[in-house]
Amino acid sequence: MAKKVTAVVKLQLPAGKATPAPPVGPALGATGINIMAFCKDYNEKTSAQVGTIIPVEITVYSDRSFTYILKTPPAADLLRKAAGIQRGSGKTGTQGAGSITRAQLRQLAETKMPDLNANDIEAAEKIIAGTARSMGIAIKD
């Protein structure tokens, strides 16, 4: 018989730096799982990507065991790194924040493809381009 799922918790945590302090502790403490076990395992698996934010989806079962799935970093985070900026523009219509090339856009779309609701790479590029536009990042040919 399959285990019964009691909760699904979604978090965005810095790679290799998860600690039982907020936001991890309060989110997982209510589910009754071993927070330190999750933190150690997460930090081990994401140690190669230190400096990026890695979303994680934790499935908690009735016997207090858990499994988790690591997702790709948020598109905004990837775009900021590619454009070499700290944050997006506060006034996207009038003020630009930076720019990326079409090749960089394609590379970001390929990276995000598993987590996007897109059937092909062109659709994924349009999704990432929309995020870039809302951040004030221009796409150069």
From Swiss-Prot:
| PTM comment | One or more lysine residues are methylated.
Keyword Secreted in the entry? The reply is no
Pfam families (UniProt xref): Ribosomal_L11 (PF00298), Ribosomal_L11_N (PF03946)
Gene Ontology cellular-component annotations: cytosolic large ribosomal subunit
Q: One MF term from GO for this chain?
A: structural constituent of ribosome
Xref: SMART domains: RL11
- Keywords from the named record: Methylation, Ribonucleoprotein, Ribosomal protein, RNA-binding, rRNA-binding
Q: Does the keyword Zinc apply?
A: no
Q: Which InterPro entries match?
A: Ribosomal_uL11, Ribosomal_uL11_bac-typ, Ribosomal_uL11_C, Ribosomal_uL11_C_sf, Ribosomal_uL11_CS, Ribosomal_uL11_N, Ribosomal_uL11_N_sf
Question: SUPFAM superfamilies recorded for this chain?
Answer: Ribosomal L11/L12e N-terminal domain, Ribosomal protein L11, C-terminal domain
Q: Which GO terms describe its biological process?
A: translation
The task this protein performs is described as: Forms part of the ribosomal stalk which helps the ribosome interact with GTP-bound translation factors.
On subunit structure and binding partners, the annotation says: Part of the ribosomal stalk of the 50S ribosomal subunit. Interacts with L10 and the large rRNA to form the base of the stalk. L10 forms an elongated spine to which L12 dimers bind in a sequential fashion forming a multimeric L10(L12)X complex.
The record's section on HAMAP family has: Ribosomal_uL11
Q: Which NCBIfam families match?
A: L11_bact
**Protein name per the record:** Large ribosomal subunit protein uL11
Q: Which organism is it from?
A: Herpetosiphon aurantiacus (strain ATCC 23779 / DSM 785 / 114-95)
